[in-house]
């Protein structure tokens, strides 16, 4: 298996290197390496590889091909000297009996692999090396081209002292004499009629090289497709027995195919006007020769598979559509209620709907709910039954927070009173009153219509009542244990529960201080 792989690699490399010998045939290489140094064909292949190496490398040793198996020992000695000069890294080729090294098939394949790799490396180094200066007279390639022109025209060898102008003048004269002997339209008019300078020829050469590289890639692709297609024919069991016959037919034709083209600027100069004729491929005369029966076969009706952009439904959205947030039920903004009142089983005030006021204090011994909430503005007059704390804007009158016995006066109000008392006025003061363990204190200060108050007091222990309902927009506060301020300036304190004054368990009326 290993020998087969080595044989395949060697054959491909030999084709790339340009070898044209008989060992490219199917099975020929394997037969030659089986005999080793006794095979003249094997020695010829080795001699060809060494000769190509000597062109690129400075080698003293040389290898000559043999004509008979009797010259095998001499060939092996020459190969041994060459490998020693090249510092071959394979011990099986440089050690052991010299006359028996190349009689083994594996060693022969290894020798070919080594020589091929060295030749490929030498050619790559030569390509990458800087070009040498051309010899005087245009170099050997130009000399060979000019020599071919002289031979084709039947010219004699030019003298050694002839100039280039004289040489090309002689070629032009000979061409005119030759063209005069042929019919007028035998050659045709040239396709390129304009004269070109050195800069133009350089650009044309660059264009030709770019096109040549492109078509080389295309040729390699087509050749590889051809190789794969032919190889696929041998996969069936029936074709495996015909592999040798297929190779004998295919390999000669395959070797002719070259990936590199031979088109040069000379072909451009030789192009004639007949190449520029445009032929219609759909004309009646042309289709008479190109028509075939398969063009007349019509396909049957096939089902419509759809897929048109205008018929495709849009995909469902990844996110649900945005919806406007629905507002909740409209409620009137209410404030926090007043404090706890007196001995009541129900709350009269509750939260005010549109009334904005201060907070009430905590009452004393009461079973009722919380007092009224925030109120709105009170327009005009004093407030009858005012709560613990008054707020908002009062256009007239004098409004003073009442006094709740046994309650907690915790709110504060800061309203603006358009009228009222000017200057400094000390309103009624209730302080230090013991209301069933409660403490009430009311600090009041009024200056020029600005009414500010702050009350604090701790009422007695009592059960919490429920919250009162929402109050209406108009009207005063429902007061539990509220206080009224009479016009005469007299301050009275009582529980508003049917006008009944309640005193129980140490709860009593507080002392009144009037200024």
From Swiss-Prot:
Sequence ranges of Low complexity compositional bias: 485-501
Gly residues bias (residue ranges): 382-395, 457-481
Biological processes annotated in GO: lysosome localization; positive regulation of cell population proliferation; positive regulation of gene expression; positive regulation of ruffle assembly; protein methylation
Disulfide bridges in this chain: none
GO molecular function: protein methyltransferase activity
Source domain of life: Eukaryota
Sequence ranges of Polar residues compositional bias: 502-515
Signal peptide interval: none
Region named Disordered: 297-411, 432-515
Compositionally biased tracts (Basic and acidic residues): 302-311, 444-456
Family: Belongs to the FAM98 family.
Subunit record text: Interacts (via N- and C-terminus) with DDX1. Interacts (via N- and C-terminus) with C14orf166. Interacts with FAM98B. Interacts with PLEKHM1 (via N- and C-terminus).
Functional note: Positively stimulates PRMT1-induced protein arginine methylation. Involved in skeletal homeostasis. Positively regulates lysosome peripheral distribution and ruffled border formation in osteoclasts.
Protein name per Swiss-Prot or TrEMBL: Protein FAM98A
Organism: Rattus norvegicus
């Amino acid at each position: 298996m290993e020998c087969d792989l080595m044989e395949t690699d060697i054959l491909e490399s030999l084709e790339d290197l340009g070898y044209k010998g008989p060992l490219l045939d199917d099975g020929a290489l394997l037969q030659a390496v089986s005999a080793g140094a006794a095979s003249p064909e094997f020695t010829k292949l080795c001699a060809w590889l060494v000769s190509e190496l000597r062109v690129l490398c400075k080698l003293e040793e040389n290898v000559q091909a043999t004509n008979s198996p009797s010259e095998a020992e001499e060939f092996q000695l020459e190969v041994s000297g060459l490998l020693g000069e090249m510092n071959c890294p394979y011990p099986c080729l440089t050690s052991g009996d010299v006359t028996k090294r190349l009689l083994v098939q594996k060693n022969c394949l290894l020798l070919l692999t080594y020589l091929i790799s060295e030749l490929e490396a030498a050619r790559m180094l030569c390509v990458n090396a800087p070009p040498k200066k051309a010899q005087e007279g245009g170099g050997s390639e130009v000399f060979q081209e000019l020599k071919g022109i002289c031979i084709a025209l039947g010219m004699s060898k030019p003298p050694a002292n002839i100039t280039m102008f004289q040489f090309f003048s002689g070629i032009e004269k000979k061409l005119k004499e030759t063209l005069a002997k042929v019919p007028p339209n035998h050659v045709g008019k040239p396709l390129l009629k304009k004269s070109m300078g050195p800069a133009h020829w350089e650009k044309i050469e660059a264009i030709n090289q770019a096109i040549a590289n492109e078509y080389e890639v295309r040729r390699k692709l087509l050749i590889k497709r051809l190789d794969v297609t032919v190889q696929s024919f041998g996969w069936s069991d029936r074709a495996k027995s015909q592999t040798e016959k297929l190779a004998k037919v295919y390999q000669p034709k395959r070797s002719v195919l070259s990936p590199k083209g031979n088109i040069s600027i000379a072909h451009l100069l030789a192009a004639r006007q007949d190449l520029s004729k445009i032929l219609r491929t759909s004309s009646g005369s042309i289709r008479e020769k190109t028509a075939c029966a398969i063009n007349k076969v019509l396909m049957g009706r096939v089902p419509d598979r759809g897929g048109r952009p205008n018929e495709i439904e849009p995909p469902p959205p990844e996110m649900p559509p945005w919806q406007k947030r629905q507002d909740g039920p409209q409620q009137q903004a209410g404030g926090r209620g007043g404090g706890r009142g007196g001995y009541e089983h129900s709350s009269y005030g509750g939260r005010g709907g549109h009334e904005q006021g201060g907070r009430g204090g905590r009452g004393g011994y009461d079973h009722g709910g919380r007092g009224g909430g925030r109120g709105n503005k009170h327009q005009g007059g004093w407030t009858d039954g005012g709560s613990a704390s008054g707020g908002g804007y009062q256009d007239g009158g004098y409004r003073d927070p009442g006094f709740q016995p046994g309650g907690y006066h915790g709110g504060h109000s800061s309203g603006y009173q358009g009228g009222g008392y000017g200057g400094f006025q000390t309103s009624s003061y209730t302080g230090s009153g013991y209301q069933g363990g409660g403490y009430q204190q009311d600090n009041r200060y009024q200056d020029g219509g600005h009414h500010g108050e702050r009350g604090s007091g701790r009422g007695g222990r009592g059960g919490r009542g429920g919250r009162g309902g929402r109050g209406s927009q108009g009207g005063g506060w429902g007061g539990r244990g509220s206080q009224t301020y009479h016009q005469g300036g007299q301050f009275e304190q009582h529980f508003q529960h049917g006008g009944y004054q309640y005193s129980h368990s140490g709860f009593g009326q507080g002392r009144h201080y009037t200024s």
